[in-house]
Amino acid sequence: IGQALALLLKNQLPSGSELSLYDIAPVTPGVAVDLSHIPTAVKIKGFSGEDVTPALEGADVVLISAGVARKPGMDRSDLFNVNAGIVKNLVQQIAKTCPKACVGIITNPVNTTVAIAAEVLKKAGVYDKNKLFGVTTLDIIRSNTFVAELKGKLPTEVEVPVIGGHSGVTILPLLSQIPGVSFTEQEAAELTKRIQNAGTEVVEAKAGGGSATLSMGQAAARFGLSLVRALQGEKDVVECAYVEGDGQYARFFSQPLLLGKNGVEERKSIGTLSAFEQHSLDA
């Protein structure tokens, strides 16, 4: 995900932004040199090795995509043992180096890595629930694509709110809330299932060659850029993400968020659900 995400950010971040790449792999500074030849006004540096500190200094937004990817036959929870440790270590460094940064966790299983990050930040005394996000944007862009295909719309005209979590049946697209589009109950059930299983569709199609890295890079870039716009004072920036809420549905829950200068400005209502959606939420 990292390289695709870095390429998109190098091209799309506002002029004057600084982009830092970090990975344990020694290739990372070279990836930054490669990207630095792209003519945009975004400064880029790459860091590798055991110490992430220089990459984090002064950061306003940190996106964590480090970890192992899914292989066929695995679900997102199979990644837990390895990826939990990676996220824990990185977040400990964030707590020390840039405790006020907004942190977006991409590393699966998001439903648990976000909770781990929250505990690490709490232990360090720097947790702000308005600044920690599980990036679920891939579920939204997939929903937009699949709905547009099914209904003959332009994908750019469709925006589907997706609530719940970021794995399997916890992913709940609110298909009933798309203006000007309606679904039969069967269509809604089939489409919901396809959105929930879209990650597996990619894992199987890649036949052992990894998971969704390019579409995830696009999703993470969209979320990161929305955060940057909101931090810079743009109004009415809304994205769905997996955050600690008021505990109405679960401690952590993906819902529409109004973003602002301090991260989450407002956790927006999930609105009125169809009977099918309500049943899925209650389950």
From Swiss-Prot:
It holds the Pfam family Ldh_1_C. PROSITE patterns: MDH. The active site is at residue 166. GO terms for cellular component: cytoplasm. Substrate binds at residues 70, 76, 108, 142. Its EC number is 1.1.1.37. It catalyses: (S)-malate + NAD(+) = oxaloacetate + NADH + H(+). Gene3D superfamilies: Lactate dehydrogenase/glycoside hydrolase, family 4, C-terminal (3.90.110.10), NAD(P)-binding Rossmann-like Domain (3.40.50.720). Keywords: NAD, Oxidoreductase, Tricarboxylic acid cycle. NAD(+) binds at residues 1-2, 23, 83, 106-108, 216. GO terms for biological process: malate metabolic process; tricarboxylic acid cycle. One of its GO terms (molecular function) is L-malate dehydrogenase (NAD+) activity. Belongs to the LDH/MDH superfamily. MDH type 1 family. Homodimer. Catalyzes the reversible oxidation of malate to oxaloacetate. PANTHER family: MALATE AND LACTATE DEHYDROGENASE, MALATE DEHYDROGENASE, MITOCHONDRIAL. This is Malate dehydrogenase. The lineage of its organism: Bacteria, Pseudomonadati, Pseudomonadota, Gammaproteobacteria, Enterobacterales.
